[in-house]
């Protein structure tokens, strides 16, 4: 990556200010309840299978989630090894891996859950080729950008806002959770991000399965509220990688942060993603595995290679 020196200085000094000012630059979100939007999907064929679901790791932050008739795609990135994405402010990053599935081989998608609008999460191929009528849920900032690109079924959420999705008799609730893409000062220069809680099933008080996706965030105080509002998380997908701007300023979790996130959110199982696909990722999966072992959490982590699938069953409440 190359960056003009004046811009480097600006970003670096802003980072230092953000580290010093901390939470002053971004007040915590204290809302008790967010806004609720709804999405009605065409009913699928056949009975709802609530017994078993799956998560397939495609690469970077892209996974396919299948459960109860829903097929959900997260942070779609289908560039190949050697391709570059633009990250803003003149920054680019090179992809080091290939996706496990080609874009053309995707199944029909019911919903895209997008943590934020960044080139390594919604790449130029996806921007050009994804059907404009595919429903997408993301931050309000991302929603505005997506609508400018012609996407017609976009829902923008702020923290604690919720999208209620129905597909025949199947029900899904997607709730946006807090996230911050780096130290406070730097995060102000980057796209707004969100985590998300996916609750499957008709009973909001006792979902059939509860999943947390961190998004590109550090472990900030606001995330402590996630397990308070959503106890009993069955599976967490954590965006790791220790991404560093110019190799200096950390803007996503590294291995140690990932373990801290597990300890805060307290999921029953965790799958690490977003860790080795781009050259801006500076913390390899081995860092996380080492920290997991040191913390005695090995039985709570599932490691997936690109293309591998984790299957789960309805949770017991």
Task: Kindly give the residue locations of the regions a language model identified.
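Pre-active-site segment of Zn-dependent metallo-hydrolases
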Residues: 40-47, 70-113, 124-129, 182-186, ...
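Conserved beta-strand hairpin/beta-sheet module of binuclear metal-dependent hydrolase folds
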Residues: 48-101, 189-215
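Bacterial N-terminal signal peptides
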Residues: 9-19
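Cap/insert and terminal regions of metallo-dependent hydrolase folds
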Residues: 95, 135, 141-144, 218-306
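Mobile, glycine- and charge-enriched loop segments
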Residues: 106, 121-136, 190-195, 199, ...
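Bacterial N-terminal signal peptides that target proteins for export
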Residues: 1-11
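Metallo-beta-lactamase
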Residues: 27-50, 109-120, 138-209, 270, 291-315
């Amino acid at each position: 990556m190359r960056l003009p020196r004046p811009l480097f200085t600006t970003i670096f000094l802003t980072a230092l200010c953000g580290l010093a000012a901390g939470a002053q630059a971004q007040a915590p979100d204290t809302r008790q309840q967010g806004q609720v939007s709804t999405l009605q999907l065409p009913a699928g064929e056949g009975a709802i299978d609530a017994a078993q679901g799956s998560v397939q790791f495609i690469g970077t932050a892209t996974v396919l989630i299948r459960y109860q008739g829903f097929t959900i795609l997260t942070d779609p990135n289908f560039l190949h090894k050697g391709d570059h994405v633009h990250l803003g402010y003149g920054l680019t990053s090179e992809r080091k891996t290939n996706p496990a599935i080609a874009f053309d081989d995707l199944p029909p998608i019911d919903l895209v859950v997008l943590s934020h609008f960044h080139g390594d999460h919604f790449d130029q191929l996806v921007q050009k080729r994804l059907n404009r009528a595919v429903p997408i849920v993301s931050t309000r900032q991302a929603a505005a950008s997506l609508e400018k690109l012609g996407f017609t079924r976009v829902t923008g959420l702020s923290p604690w806002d919720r999208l209620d999705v129905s597909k025949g008799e199947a029900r899904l609730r997607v709730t946006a959770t807090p996230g911050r893409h780096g130290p406070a000062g730097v995060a102000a220069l980057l796209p707004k991000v969100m985590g998300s809680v996916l609750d499957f099933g008709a009973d909001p008080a006792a979902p059939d399965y509860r999943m947390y996706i961190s998004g590109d965030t550090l472990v900030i105080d606001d995330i402590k509220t996630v397990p308070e509002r959503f106890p009993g998380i069955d599976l967490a997908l954590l965006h790791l990688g220790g991404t560093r701007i110019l190799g200096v300023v950390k803007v996503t979790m590294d291995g140690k942060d990932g373990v801290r996130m597990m300890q805060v959110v307290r999921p029953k199982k965790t799958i690490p993603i977003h860790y080795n696909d781009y050259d801006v990722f500076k913390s390899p999966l081995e860092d996380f595995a080492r920290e997991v072992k040191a913390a005695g959490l090995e039985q709570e982590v599932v490691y997936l290679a690109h293309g591998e699938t984790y299957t789960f069953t309805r949770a017991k409440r």
